[in-house]
């Protein structure tokens, strides 16, 4: 139980680091839209649309770069001599590390879905992210519950990963469709 709570703290750390990236991303997106609407010539809206798409993918790249840095940081916390084993005098079992990695990937997908949702909310499309989060929660709870009860408790993280994946896919699709229709 103690090891599980430490690993959960690592996953929360990943998510909190990514939340800062989300805050930066939506602030720069809003600023871009405000400035872009003022300076874009009405005869060349495709230039604005292309810049908007480019900025979105730059924000996704920033999210992944931050995620990679967070994973490296957590890897050192787990494996460095001054890290987990040095502080708690216990070694982490492979299962705990596996659950942590799967959970971390799930949190990255969740953060990407949240970035997509922030874009959609900013653009006035509120229903699509709400539907996506409802579907994701249903998948997370049902799949996580079934796997954890009938196979092993650690498989509940697979439900979270799948739910986050569905959330990301649905919100990404909504963003791409919006960008295509600009």
Question: Where are the regions that the model predicts?
Answer:
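Membrane-interface segments at the starts/ends of alpha-helical transmembrane spans
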Residues: 1-11, 88-95
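Specific pore-lining/lateral-gate transmembrane helices of multi-pass inner-membrane transport
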Residues: 5-83
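Transmembrane helix-loop junctions in multipass membrane proteins, especially transporters and channels
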Residues: 23-27, 31, 75-87, 123, ...
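Interfacial segments at transmembrane-helix termini and the short loops linking adjacent helices
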Residues: 71-103, 108
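Short runs within selected transmembrane alpha-helices of multi-pass transporters and secretion channels
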Residues: 98-123, 129-144, 156-172
């Amino acid at each position: 139980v103690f090891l599980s709570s430490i690993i959960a703290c690592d996953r929360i750390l990943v998510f909190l680091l990514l939340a800062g990236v989300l805050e930066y991303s939506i602030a720069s997106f809003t600023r871009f839209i405000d400035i872009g609407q003022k300076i874009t010539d009405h005869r060349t809206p495709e230039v604005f649309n292309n810049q908007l798409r480019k900025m979105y993918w730059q924000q996704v790249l920033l999210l992944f770069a931050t995620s990679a840095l967070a994973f490296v940081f957590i890897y050192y916390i787990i494996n460095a001599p001054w890290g987990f084993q040095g502080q708690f005098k216990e070694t982490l079992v492979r299962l705990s590390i596996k659950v942590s990695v799967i959970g971390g990937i799930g949190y990255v997908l969740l953060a990407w879905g949240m970035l997509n949702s922030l874009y959609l909310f900013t653009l006035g499309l509120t229903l699509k992210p709400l539907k996506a989060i409802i579907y994701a929660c249903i998948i997370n709870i049902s799949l996580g519950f079934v796997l954890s009860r009938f196979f092993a408790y650690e498989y509940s993280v697979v439900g979270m990963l799948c739910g986050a994946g569905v959330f990301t896919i649905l919100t990404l699709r909504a963003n791409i469709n919006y960008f295509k229709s600009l």
